[in-house]
Swiss-Prot record:
It is found in: Cytoplasm. SUPFAM superfamilies: P-loop containing nucleoside triphosphate hydrolases. Belongs to the ClpX chaperone family. HslU subfamily. One of its GO terms (biological process) is proteolysis involved in protein catabolic process. One of its GO terms (cellular component) is HslUV protease complex. It comes from Wigglesworthia glossinidia brevipalpis. Its main location: cytoplasm. Pfam families: AAA, AAA_2. ATP binds at I18, G60, V61, G62, K63, T64, E65, D256, E321, R393. ATPase subunit of a proteasome-like degradation complex; this subunit has chaperone activity. The binding of ATP and its subsequent hydrolysis by HslU are essential for unfolding of protein substrates subsequently hydrolyzed by HslV. HslU recognizes the N-terminal part of its protein substrates and unfolds these before they are guided to HslV for hydrolysis. This is ATP-dependent protease ATPase subunit HslU. The lineage of its organism: Bacteria, Pseudomonadati, Pseudomonadota, Gammaproteobacteria, Enterobacterales. A double ring-shaped homohexamer of HslV is capped on each side by a ring-shaped HslU homohexamer. The assembly of the HslU/HslV complex is dependent on binding of ATP. Keywords: ATP-binding, Chaperone, Cytoplasm, Nucleotide-binding.
Length: 443
Protein backbone atom coordinates (compact mmCIF):
# COMPACT_ATOMS: atom_id res chain seq x y z
CA UNK A 1 0.00 0.00 0.00
CA UNK A 2 2.97 2.35 0.66
CA UNK A 3 3.68 2.61 -3.09
CA UNK A 4 0.03 3.43 -3.89
CA UNK A 5 0.37 7.21 -3.97
CA UNK A 6 -2.64 9.24 -5.18
CA UNK A 7 -0.98 9.61 -8.60
CA UNK A 8 -0.42 5.84 -8.85
CA UNK A 9 -4.02 5.14 -7.82
CA UNK A 10 -5.35 7.54 -10.48
CA UNK A 11 -3.05 5.94 -13.06
CA UNK A 12 -4.40 2.49 -12.16
CA UNK A 13 -8.00 3.73 -12.37
CA UNK A 14 -7.22 5.31 -15.76
CA UNK A 15 -6.54 1.85 -17.21
CA UNK A 16 -10.19 0.89 -16.53
CA UNK A 17 -12.19 4.14 -16.51
CA UNK A 18 -12.05 6.97 -19.05
CA UNK A 19 -12.08 10.61 -17.90
CA UNK A 20 -13.60 11.80 -14.58
CA UNK A 21 -10.22 12.98 -13.24
CA UNK A 22 -11.74 14.95 -10.31
CA UNK A 23 -13.64 11.91 -9.00
CA UNK A 24 -10.57 9.67 -9.33
CA UNK A 25 -8.47 12.27 -7.54
CA UNK A 26 -10.95 12.49 -4.64
CA UNK A 27 -11.14 8.71 -4.07
CA UNK A 28 -7.34 8.37 -4.46
CA UNK A 29 -6.76 10.95 -1.71
CA UNK A 30 -9.37 9.22 0.51
CA UNK A 31 -7.60 5.86 0.06
CA UNK A 32 -4.15 7.33 0.70
CA UNK A 33 -5.40 9.03 3.86
CA UNK A 34 -6.29 5.59 5.23
CA UNK A 35 -2.67 4.48 4.88
CA UNK A 36 -1.50 7.77 6.44
CA UNK A 37 -3.91 7.29 9.36
CA UNK A 38 -2.51 3.82 10.13
CA UNK A 39 0.96 5.42 10.53
CA UNK A 40 -0.23 7.77 13.30
CA UNK A 41 0.05 7.21 17.05
CA UNK A 42 -2.90 5.42 18.66
CA UNK A 43 -4.07 8.56 20.47
CA UNK A 44 -4.39 10.55 17.23
CA UNK A 45 -5.38 7.65 14.94
CA UNK A 46 -8.81 7.26 16.57
CA UNK A 47 -9.54 10.95 16.05
CA UNK A 48 -8.92 10.91 12.28
CA UNK A 49 -12.13 9.90 10.51
CA UNK A 50 -12.57 9.34 6.75
CA UNK A 51 -13.95 12.19 4.66
CA UNK A 52 -17.01 10.68 2.99
CA UNK A 53 -17.66 11.46 -0.68
CA UNK A 54 -20.77 12.44 -2.64
CA UNK A 55 -20.50 11.79 -6.40
CA UNK A 56 -22.90 13.76 -8.58
CA UNK A 57 -23.32 12.87 -12.23
CA UNK A 58 -25.61 11.31 -14.84
CA UNK A 59 -26.01 7.54 -15.11
CA UNK A 60 -23.37 5.52 -16.94
CA UNK A 61 -20.41 7.88 -16.48
CA UNK A 62 -18.36 5.67 -14.13
CA UNK A 63 -19.49 6.43 -10.55
CA UNK A 64 -20.02 2.80 -9.51
CA UNK A 65 -17.02 1.53 -11.45
CA UNK A 66 -14.66 3.98 -9.71
CA UNK A 67 -15.76 2.72 -6.27
CA UNK A 68 -15.59 -0.96 -7.33
CA UNK A 69 -12.09 -0.63 -8.83
CA UNK A 70 -10.93 1.30 -5.76
CA UNK A 71 -12.02 -1.54 -3.45
CA UNK A 72 -10.16 -4.11 -5.60
CA UNK A 73 -7.09 -1.91 -5.57
CA UNK A 74 -7.16 -1.56 -1.78
CA UNK A 75 -8.08 -5.25 -1.25
CA UNK A 76 -10.69 -3.90 1.14
CA UNK A 77 -14.15 -5.19 2.12
CA UNK A 78 -16.60 -3.51 -0.26
CA UNK A 79 -20.35 -3.48 -0.72
CA UNK A 80 -22.60 -1.63 -3.16
CA UNK A 81 -26.18 -0.96 -2.10
CA UNK A 82 -29.15 0.85 -3.61
CA UNK A 83 -30.59 3.49 -1.29
CA UNK A 84 -34.09 2.80 -2.62
CA UNK A 85 -34.14 -0.75 -1.18
CA UNK A 86 -34.19 0.43 2.42
CA UNK A 87 -37.04 1.60 4.61
CA UNK A 88 -37.34 3.40 7.91
CA UNK A 89 -37.05 1.29 11.09
CA UNK A 90 -40.43 -0.17 12.02
CA UNK A 91 -41.67 -0.60 8.46
CA UNK A 92 -41.59 -3.72 6.29
CA UNK A 93 -38.37 -3.80 4.29
CA UNK A 94 -34.61 -3.86 4.78
CA UNK A 95 -33.15 -1.72 7.55
CA UNK A 96 -29.93 0.22 6.94
CA UNK A 97 -28.04 -1.81 9.59
CA UNK A 98 -28.11 -4.73 7.14
CA UNK A 99 -25.53 -2.78 5.05
CA UNK A 100 -22.90 -3.36 7.75
CA UNK A 101 -23.97 -6.99 8.24
CA UNK A 102 -23.61 -7.66 4.52
CA UNK A 103 -20.26 -5.83 4.48
CA UNK A 104 -19.03 -8.01 7.36
CA UNK A 105 -20.18 -11.17 5.56
CA UNK A 106 -18.24 -10.03 2.47
CA UNK A 107 -15.19 -9.39 4.65
CA UNK A 108 -15.38 -12.87 6.25
CA UNK A 109 -15.58 -14.43 2.80
CA UNK A 110 -12.59 -12.37 1.59
CA UNK A 111 -10.40 -13.18 4.63
CA UNK A 112 -11.40 -16.86 4.45
CA UNK A 113 -10.33 -17.07 0.79
CA UNK A 114 -7.03 -15.36 1.65
CA UNK A 115 -6.46 -17.85 4.48
CA UNK A 116 -7.28 -20.82 2.20
CA UNK A 117 -4.84 -19.50 -0.42
CA UNK A 118 -2.17 -19.07 2.26
CA UNK A 119 -2.58 -22.71 3.38
CA UNK A 120 -3.06 -24.09 -0.14
CA UNK A 121 0.38 -25.73 -0.40
CA UNK A 122 -0.10 -27.62 2.89
CA UNK A 123 -3.68 -28.59 1.90
CA UNK A 124 -2.41 -29.97 -1.44
CA UNK A 125 0.17 -32.10 0.40
CA UNK A 126 -2.49 -33.53 2.74
CA UNK A 127 -4.86 -34.18 -0.17
CA UNK A 128 -2.05 -36.01 -2.03
CA UNK A 129 -1.41 -38.22 1.00
CA UNK A 130 -5.09 -39.17 1.21
CA UNK A 131 -5.22 -40.08 -2.49
CA UNK A 132 -1.98 -42.08 -2.17
CA UNK A 133 -3.39 -43.93 0.85
CA UNK A 134 -6.25 -45.11 -1.39
CA UNK A 135 -3.99 -45.98 -4.34
CA UNK A 136 -1.38 -47.77 -2.18
CA UNK A 137 -2.94 -49.05 1.06
CA UNK A 138 -0.31 -49.19 3.84
CA UNK A 139 0.81 -52.69 4.86
CA UNK A 140 -0.32 -53.81 8.33
CA UNK A 141 2.14 -55.63 10.60
CA UNK A 142 1.28 -58.42 13.06
CA UNK A 143 0.05 -55.93 15.66
CA UNK A 144 -2.29 -54.19 13.18
CA UNK A 145 -0.19 -51.04 12.90
CA UNK A 146 0.65 -49.37 9.58
CA UNK A 147 4.26 -49.75 8.51
CA UNK A 148 6.52 -47.56 6.36
CA UNK A 149 4.97 -44.28 7.55
CA UNK A 150 8.31 -42.57 8.08
CA UNK A 151 10.04 -43.99 5.02
CA UNK A 152 7.74 -43.82 1.98
CA UNK A 153 8.11 -46.75 -0.37
CA UNK A 154 9.50 -46.42 -3.89
CA UNK A 155 6.04 -47.26 -5.31
CA UNK A 156 4.47 -44.43 -3.30
CA UNK A 157 7.07 -41.98 -4.58
CA UNK A 158 6.43 -43.07 -8.18
CA UNK A 159 2.69 -42.58 -7.73
CA UNK A 160 3.32 -39.17 -6.13
CA UNK A 161 5.27 -38.08 -9.23
CA UNK A 162 2.45 -39.29 -11.48
CA UNK A 163 -0.05 -37.34 -9.36
CA UNK A 164 2.01 -34.15 -9.68
CA UNK A 165 2.36 -34.58 -13.48
CA UNK A 166 -1.44 -35.23 -13.71
CA UNK A 167 -0.93 -38.64 -15.35
CA UNK A 168 -3.55 -40.18 -13.04
CA UNK A 169 -6.22 -37.45 -13.44
CA UNK A 170 -8.64 -39.70 -15.35
CA UNK A 171 -8.27 -42.74 -13.06
CA UNK A 172 -11.30 -43.45 -10.84
CA UNK A 173 -10.93 -44.08 -7.10
CA UNK A 174 -13.31 -44.58 -4.19
CA UNK A 175 -12.62 -42.15 -1.39
CA UNK A 176 -14.36 -40.94 1.78
CA UNK A 177 -15.45 -37.31 1.50
CA UNK A 178 -17.37 -35.05 3.85
CA UNK A 179 -21.02 -35.15 2.82
CA UNK A 180 -22.83 -31.86 2.33
CA UNK A 181 -25.50 -31.40 5.01
CA UNK A 182 -29.07 -31.12 3.72
CA UNK A 183 -29.95 -27.44 3.43
CA UNK A 184 -32.95 -26.19 5.40
CA UNK A 185 -34.80 -23.43 3.55
CA UNK A 186 -36.50 -20.96 5.90
CA UNK A 187 -38.78 -18.28 4.51
CA UNK A 188 -38.57 -15.08 6.53
CA UNK A 189 -40.07 -11.61 6.07
CA UNK A 190 -37.76 -8.72 5.03
CA UNK A 191 -35.59 -7.53 7.89
CA UNK A 192 -35.44 -11.00 9.52
CA UNK A 193 -32.50 -12.32 7.45
CA UNK A 194 -30.24 -12.44 10.54
CA UNK A 195 -32.59 -14.81 12.38
CA UNK A 196 -32.91 -17.00 9.26
CA UNK A 197 -29.13 -17.22 8.96
CA UNK A 198 -28.75 -18.23 12.63
CA UNK A 199 -31.43 -20.94 12.36
CA UNK A 200 -29.83 -22.39 9.21
CA UNK A 201 -26.43 -22.41 10.93
CA UNK A 202 -27.95 -24.20 13.95
CA UNK A 203 -29.54 -26.93 11.79
CA UNK A 204 -26.28 -27.34 9.88
CA UNK A 205 -24.33 -27.87 13.13
CA UNK A 206 -26.91 -30.38 14.40
CA UNK A 207 -26.47 -32.47 11.25
CA UNK A 208 -22.70 -32.66 11.78
CA UNK A 209 -20.04 -33.61 9.25
CA UNK A 210 -20.35 -37.19 8.04
CA UNK A 211 -17.91 -39.04 5.77
CA UNK A 212 -19.45 -40.64 2.72
CA UNK A 213 -17.65 -42.93 0.20
CA UNK A 214 -17.72 -41.62 -3.37
CA UNK A 215 -16.34 -43.02 -6.62
CA UNK A 216 -14.85 -40.16 -8.66
CA UNK A 217 -11.91 -39.32 -10.90
CA UNK A 218 -8.64 -38.34 -9.20
CA UNK A 219 -8.74 -34.82 -10.69
CA UNK A 220 -12.11 -34.12 -9.05
CA UNK A 221 -11.06 -35.95 -5.86
CA UNK A 222 -7.99 -33.71 -5.50
CA UNK A 223 -10.11 -30.57 -5.89
CA UNK A 224 -12.62 -31.69 -3.25
CA UNK A 225 -9.92 -32.94 -0.87
CA UNK A 226 -7.96 -29.68 -1.14
CA UNK A 227 -11.15 -27.78 -0.20
CA UNK A 228 -11.79 -30.15 2.70
CA UNK A 229 -8.23 -29.99 4.04
CA UNK A 230 -8.09 -26.20 3.61
CA UNK A 231 -11.25 -25.87 5.72
CA UNK A 232 -9.59 -27.95 8.47
CA UNK A 233 -6.46 -25.78 8.47
CA UNK A 234 -8.21 -22.43 8.94
CA UNK A 235 -9.23 -20.99 12.30
CA UNK A 236 -12.79 -19.63 11.98
CA UNK A 237 -12.63 -17.51 15.15
CA UNK A 238 -9.40 -15.87 13.97
CA UNK A 239 -10.95 -15.23 10.54
CA UNK A 240 -13.98 -13.54 12.16
CA UNK A 241 -11.72 -11.29 14.26
CA UNK A 242 -9.64 -10.31 11.22
CA UNK A 243 -12.78 -9.75 9.14
CA UNK A 244 -14.34 -7.42 11.73
CA UNK A 245 -11.05 -5.49 12.00
CA UNK A 246 -10.82 -5.23 8.19
CA UNK A 247 -14.36 -3.81 8.04
CA UNK A 248 -13.71 -1.30 10.84
CA UNK A 249 -10.38 -0.05 9.45
CA UNK A 250 -10.71 -0.47 5.66
CA UNK A 251 -14.40 -1.08 4.80
CA UNK A 252 -15.92 0.82 1.86
CA UNK A 253 -19.69 1.26 1.44
CA UNK A 254 -21.00 2.58 -1.88
CA UNK A 255 -24.58 3.90 -1.65
CA UNK A 256 -26.06 4.36 -5.11
CA UNK A 257 -29.22 6.26 -6.10
CA UNK A 258 -29.07 8.45 -3.00
CA UNK A 259 -30.91 11.19 -4.94
CA UNK A 260 -33.99 8.93 -5.04
CA UNK A 261 -34.44 9.24 -1.25
CA UNK A 262 -34.39 13.04 -1.29
CA UNK A 263 -37.60 14.64 -0.03
CA UNK A 264 -38.50 17.44 -2.40
CA UNK A 265 -40.40 20.48 -1.20
CA UNK A 266 -43.58 19.92 -3.23
CA UNK A 267 -44.15 16.42 -1.80
CA UNK A 268 -46.15 16.20 1.43
CA UNK A 269 -47.35 13.37 3.63
CA UNK A 270 -45.51 10.39 5.12
CA UNK A 271 -42.85 8.80 2.93
CA UNK A 272 -41.25 5.69 4.40
CA UNK A 273 -38.49 5.36 1.83
CA UNK A 274 -37.19 8.91 1.91
CA UNK A 275 -36.44 11.15 4.87
CA UNK A 276 -36.71 8.30 7.36
CA UNK A 277 -34.03 6.32 5.50
CA UNK A 278 -31.76 9.37 5.47
CA UNK A 279 -32.17 9.73 9.23
CA UNK A 280 -31.40 6.03 9.74
CA UNK A 281 -28.24 6.42 7.64
CA UNK A 282 -26.97 9.25 9.85
CA UNK A 283 -25.65 7.14 12.78
CA UNK A 284 -23.99 4.68 10.36
CA UNK A 285 -22.14 7.44 8.52
CA UNK A 286 -21.36 9.37 11.70
CA UNK A 287 -20.14 6.28 13.57
CA UNK A 288 -22.01 3.73 15.68
CA UNK A 289 -21.79 0.08 16.71
CA UNK A 290 -23.76 -2.52 14.76
CA UNK A 291 -24.41 -6.04 16.02
CA UNK A 292 -23.61 -8.79 13.48
CA UNK A 293 -23.37 -12.58 13.76
CA UNK A 294 -19.56 -12.20 13.59
CA UNK A 295 -19.36 -9.68 16.43
CA UNK A 296 -19.87 -5.98 17.13
CA UNK A 297 -18.71 -3.69 14.31
CA UNK A 298 -17.84 0.00 14.78
CA UNK A 299 -18.56 2.15 11.73
CA UNK A 300 -16.45 5.18 12.76
CA UNK A 301 -13.72 4.57 10.16
CA UNK A 302 -15.71 3.00 7.31
CA UNK A 303 -15.54 5.09 4.12
CA UNK A 304 -18.97 5.93 2.68
CA UNK A 305 -19.23 6.94 -0.98
CA UNK A 306 -22.71 8.09 -2.01
CA UNK A 307 -23.74 8.76 -5.59
CA UNK A 308 -26.72 9.99 -7.54
CA UNK A 309 -27.70 11.53 -10.85
CA UNK A 310 -29.60 14.41 -9.13
CA UNK A 311 -31.57 15.14 -12.31
CA UNK A 312 -34.83 15.88 -10.47
CA UNK A 313 -33.58 16.52 -6.94
CA UNK A 314 -30.56 18.58 -5.80
CA UNK A 315 -27.88 17.66 -3.24
CA UNK A 316 -29.39 20.44 -1.08
CA UNK A 317 -32.61 18.35 -0.88
CA UNK A 318 -30.79 15.86 1.36
CA UNK A 319 -31.40 16.52 5.04
CA UNK A 320 -28.76 19.00 6.37
CA UNK A 321 -27.26 16.48 8.82
CA UNK A 322 -26.52 14.00 6.01
CA UNK A 323 -25.12 16.75 3.78
CA UNK A 324 -22.67 17.59 6.55
CA UNK A 325 -21.50 13.98 6.74
CA UNK A 326 -20.65 13.92 3.01
CA UNK A 327 -18.12 16.78 2.96
CA UNK A 328 -16.37 15.99 -0.34
CA UNK A 329 -18.51 16.75 -3.41
CA UNK A 330 -17.37 15.59 -6.84
CA UNK A 331 -19.23 16.33 -10.06
CA UNK A 332 -18.80 13.84 -12.90
CA UNK A 333 -19.23 15.17 -16.41
CA UNK A 334 -21.39 13.66 -19.15
CA UNK A 335 -19.50 11.61 -21.74
CA UNK A 336 -18.58 13.06 -25.15
CA UNK A 337 -17.96 11.34 -28.52
CA UNK A 338 -14.20 11.39 -27.78
CA UNK A 339 -14.84 9.68 -24.42
CA UNK A 340 -16.90 6.97 -26.14
CA UNK A 341 -14.05 6.36 -28.62
CA UNK A 342 -11.57 5.97 -25.75
CA UNK A 343 -13.95 3.66 -23.85
CA UNK A 344 -14.12 1.41 -26.92
CA UNK A 345 -10.34 1.11 -27.29
CA UNK A 346 -8.25 2.18 -24.29
CA UNK A 347 -9.32 0.10 -21.22
CA UNK A 348 -7.45 -3.20 -20.75
CA UNK A 349 -10.75 -5.08 -21.22
CA UNK A 350 -12.52 -2.73 -23.63
CA UNK A 351 -15.76 -3.80 -25.34
CA UNK A 352 -14.09 -4.16 -28.76
CA UNK A 353 -11.43 -6.47 -27.26
CA UNK A 354 -14.15 -8.51 -25.52
CA UNK A 355 -16.16 -9.04 -28.72
CA UNK A 356 -13.01 -9.86 -30.74
CA UNK A 357 -11.98 -12.46 -28.13
CA UNK A 358 -15.49 -13.98 -27.98
CA UNK A 359 -15.70 -14.41 -31.75
CA UNK A 360 -12.12 -15.74 -31.92
CA UNK A 361 -13.28 -18.77 -29.88
CA UNK A 362 -15.30 -19.82 -32.96
CA UNK A 363 -12.52 -18.97 -35.43
CA UNK A 364 -14.01 -15.65 -36.61
CA UNK A 365 -11.45 -12.82 -36.80
CA UNK A 366 -12.98 -9.43 -35.96
CA UNK A 367 -11.10 -6.17 -36.50
CA UNK A 368 -12.37 -2.66 -35.74
CA UNK A 369 -11.05 0.28 -37.80
CA UNK A 370 -10.63 3.76 -36.29
CA UNK A 371 -13.38 5.08 -38.60
CA UNK A 372 -15.70 2.26 -37.49
CA UNK A 373 -15.07 3.01 -33.81
CA UNK A 374 -15.73 6.72 -34.39
CA UNK A 375 -19.01 5.88 -36.13
CA UNK A 376 -20.09 3.63 -33.20
CA UNK A 377 -19.24 6.44 -30.73
CA UNK A 378 -21.25 8.96 -32.79
CA UNK A 379 -24.24 6.58 -32.94
CA UNK A 380 -24.17 6.06 -29.14
CA UNK A 381 -23.95 9.80 -28.53
CA UNK A 382 -26.79 10.53 -30.98
CA UNK A 383 -29.14 7.96 -29.40
CA UNK A 384 -28.29 9.27 -25.91
CA UNK A 385 -29.16 12.81 -27.02
CA UNK A 386 -32.41 11.87 -28.76
CA UNK A 387 -33.73 9.45 -26.10
CA UNK A 388 -32.58 8.88 -22.50
CA UNK A 389 -28.93 9.57 -21.67
CA UNK A 390 -27.66 6.32 -20.13
CA UNK A 391 -23.99 7.12 -20.67
CA UNK A 392 -21.49 4.39 -21.55
CA UNK A 393 -24.14 1.69 -21.06
CA UNK A 394 -25.51 2.71 -24.47
CA UNK A 395 -22.37 1.21 -26.06
CA UNK A 396 -23.41 -2.26 -24.85
CA UNK A 397 -26.76 -1.91 -26.64
CA UNK A 398 -25.23 -0.49 -29.83
CA UNK A 399 -22.47 -3.13 -30.05
CA UNK A 400 -24.84 -5.99 -29.28
CA UNK A 401 -27.05 -4.86 -32.16
CA UNK A 402 -24.04 -4.37 -34.44
CA UNK A 403 -22.61 -7.83 -33.68
CA UNK A 404 -25.93 -9.69 -33.72
CA UNK A 405 -25.52 -11.18 -37.21
CA UNK A 406 -21.88 -12.21 -36.59
CA UNK A 407 -22.74 -13.80 -33.21
CA UNK A 408 -25.63 -15.73 -34.74
CA UNK A 409 -23.61 -17.13 -37.67
CA UNK A 410 -20.18 -17.42 -35.99
CA UNK A 411 -20.26 -21.24 -35.80
CA UNK A 412 -20.68 -21.41 -39.61
CA UNK A 413 -18.15 -18.65 -40.40
CA UNK A 414 -15.04 -20.42 -39.05
CA UNK A 415 -11.92 -18.79 -40.52
CA UNK A 416 -13.80 -15.74 -41.81
CA UNK A 417 -12.35 -12.24 -41.33
CA UNK A 418 -14.77 -9.38 -40.67
CA UNK A 419 -13.64 -5.77 -40.85
CA UNK A 420 -15.91 -3.41 -38.94
CA UNK A 421 -15.43 -0.04 -40.62
CA UNK A 422 -17.62 3.06 -41.05
CA UNK A 423 -19.59 1.47 -43.94
CA UNK A 424 -20.31 -1.71 -41.93
CA UNK A 425 -21.57 0.37 -38.98
CA UNK A 426 -23.70 2.59 -41.29
CA UNK A 427 -25.32 -0.42 -42.98
CA UNK A 428 -26.28 -2.00 -39.65
CA UNK A 429 -27.15 1.03 -37.50
CA UNK A 430 -28.07 4.12 -39.57
CA UNK A 431 -31.76 3.20 -39.95
CA UNK A 432 -32.16 2.49 -36.24
CA UNK A 433 -30.25 5.60 -35.10
CA UNK A 434 -32.08 8.02 -37.43
CA UNK A 435 -35.56 6.71 -36.57
CA UNK A 436 -36.29 8.02 -33.06
CA UNK A 437 -39.14 5.58 -32.43
CA UNK A 438 -36.96 2.58 -33.32
CA UNK A 439 -34.09 3.98 -31.22
CA UNK A 440 -36.35 4.35 -28.21
CA UNK A 441 -37.45 0.70 -28.30
CA UNK A 442 -34.42 -1.11 -29.77
CA UNK A 443 -31.33 0.91 -28.84
Amino acid sequence: MSNMTPKNIVKELDSHIIGQHDAKKAVAIALRNRWRRMKLDDSLRHEVTPKNILMIGPTGVGKTEIARRLAKLAKAPFIKVEATKFTEVGYVGKEVDSIIRDLTDASVKMIRLQSIEKNRFRAEELAEERVLDVLIPSVKNDWGNSENKKEPSKTRQNFRKKLKTKELDDKEIEINLASTPIGVEIMAPPGMEEMTSQLQSMFKNLAGQKQKPRKIKIKEAMRLLIEEESAKLINLEEIKEKAVEAVEQNGIVFIDEIDKICKRGEISGPDVSREGVQRDLLPLVEGCTVSTKHGMVKTDHILFIASGAFQVANPSDLIPELQGRLPIRVELSALTIEDFEKILTEPSASLTKQYSALMATEGVIISFTQEGIKKIAEAACQVNDSTENIGARRLHTILERLMEEVSYNASEWNGKKINIDADYVSNHLDKLVSDEDLSRFIL
